[in-house]
Amino acid sequence: STLLLRALSEYDSVTALSFDYGQKHRVELQRAQSLIDYLASKGHNVTYKQIKLDGLVDLLNSSLVQGGDDVPEGHYEQDNMKETVVPNRNKMFASITQAVALSKANATQEQVDICLGIHAGDHAVYPDCRQEFRDADDAAFRIGNWEAERVGYFTPYLDTDKLGILQDGLVLCDELNIDFDDVYKRTNTSYKPYPSGNSDYKSASSVERIEAFIALGRPDPVQYEDETGPVSYEVAKASVEKVLAEYSA
């Protein structure tokens, strides 16, 4: 979502893509549409397309897709986080995005950039987040397509951690005249959201998000929940602080 704000700041025309591949955290698709609608209400128009790959759900083996094992809890660096890998996910997303970008570039005869939210916190547990994967994927795209030089990449957070991304979000919200909390409450990081749409605070993705908000010194505007029902940010924060203390001990 911060990347989308950065793209609105840098480009005259922005197209945003989301993917429905049968993920358990499908609430992210609803939040994406809500954010697009909010931005439009503030005069920032984005072409938004949701690409359905839900026919894959019965074919993929991962705790993140419907029918898979339970999503593990804890810190990202724990070995059990390999269960959250979706085979070839980023390759599928990259291929579709490259096809869209090149089609647009050929239609307009203009340079088109693919904006990627790659950041310094991307984890080694995900092989398709590694630099060697991205280099090989880009090479295959350029070998396999005519006029591929018309497509470039915009990676503003390559050397930035999640705290730095949130800090940029604060700057961008001021620049674009939008409210930080109104933006970020329309996001989802949780891999284990509740049926209500509220986020858990124990899965690794949620732990890392809350850790960044703790460092930012600002409450996370999303609603958290556990087996007792909705909980305050302070409850989620205390749980994450305990996880971080145990991990670093």
Residue ranges and their predicted role:
Residues 177-201:
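Immediate flanking context of iron-sulfur cluster ligation sites
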Residues 109, 114, 187-189, 218-226:
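Charge-dense, low-complexity polyampholytic segments
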Residues 196-232, 236-243:
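Iron-sulfur (Fe-S) cluster-binding segments and ferredoxin-like electron-carrier domains
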Residues 244-249:
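Short flanking/linker segments adjacent to small metal-binding domains or redox-active Cys/His motifs
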Residues 134, 166, 184-187, 200-203, ...:
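Short amphipathic alpha-helical surface patches that serve as generic macromolecular interface elements
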Residues 1-180, 206:
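ATP-dependent adenylation/nucleotidyltransferase module used to activate substrates
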